[in-house]
């Protein structure tokens, strides 16, 4: 029973950290990266379709993304979707290729993004700690039902704490890397 509880906590903590990394990757840095456009949905024949299903997105240089739309008739809809997204990007169509120059981030915008990333990291830490609390509660329930001894309970709680520390450290490292990325000019 203890092993299952600890494994469940570990799996949930891993998912929390992965979710945080995914959220952080969506925060725009000064560099062009195709994942910036992951959240863009295009109205394609009346259906909202993810942009990455309609176009090949590549990085042309550190400040420019290039899109090659598979269906040329959808180019206008793709451009409109990018303009209407909250990313603040202005695509420029050049025949079959749509180029998206990324404006450099201002110092003020960088600081705002760092605040956002720090808040996301704190939410990630809170999620990991909540998982720890749930797992420790499950262990205490096993102790109350006399399915485990007090020593087993203490050992399980120590192991859960080690897992918590490990995943909080991963969150802190991801935050540090993202902050450095954001503040880099």
UniProtKB/Swiss-Prot annotation:
Subcellular location: Cytoplasm
Keyword entries, A-Z: Cytoplasm, Protein biosynthesis
One biological process term in Gene Ontology: cytoplasmic translational termination
GO cellular component, one term: cytosol
Signal peptide residues on this chain, from the entry's feature table: none
Molecular-function annotations in GO: ribosomal large subunit binding
Cited Pfam families: RRF (PF01765)
Highest taxon of the lineage: Bacteria
Alphabetized SUPFAM superfamilies for the sequence: Ribosome recycling factor, RRF
Function recorded in the entry: Responsible for the release of ribosomes from messenger RNA at the termination of protein biosynthesis. May increase the efficiency of translation by recycling ribosomes from one round of translation to another.
Annotated NCBIfam families: frr
Protein family according to the UniProt entry: Belongs to the RRF family.
HAMAP family hit by this protein: RRF
Protein's UniProt name: Ribosome-recycling factor
Species for this entry: Idiomarina loihiensis (strain ATCC BAA-735 / DSM 15497 / L2-TR)
């Amino acid at each position: 029973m203890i092993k299952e509880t600890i494994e469940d906590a570990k799996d949930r903590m891993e998912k929390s950290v992965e979710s945080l990394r995914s959220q952080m990757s969506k925060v725009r840095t000064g560099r062009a990266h195709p994942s910036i456009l992951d959240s863009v949905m295009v109205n394609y024949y009346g259906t909202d379709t993810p942009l990455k299903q309609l176009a090949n997105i590549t990085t042309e240089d550190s400040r420019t993304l290039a899109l090659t739309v598979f269906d040329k008739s959808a180019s206008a809809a793709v451009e409109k979707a990018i303009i209407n997204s909250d990313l603040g990007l202005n695509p420029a169509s050049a025949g079959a290729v749509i180029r998206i120059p990324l404006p450099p981030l201002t110092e003020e915008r960088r600081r705002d993004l760092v605040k956002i990333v720090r808040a996301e990291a704190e939410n990630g830490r809170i999620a990991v700690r909540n998982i720890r609390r749930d797992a420790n509660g499950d262990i205490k329930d096993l102790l109350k039902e006399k399915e485990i001894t007090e020593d087993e309970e203490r050992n399980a709680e120590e192991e859960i704490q080690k897992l918590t520390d490990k995943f909080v450290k991963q969150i802190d490292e991801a935050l540090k890397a993202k902050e450095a990325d954001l503040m880099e000019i």
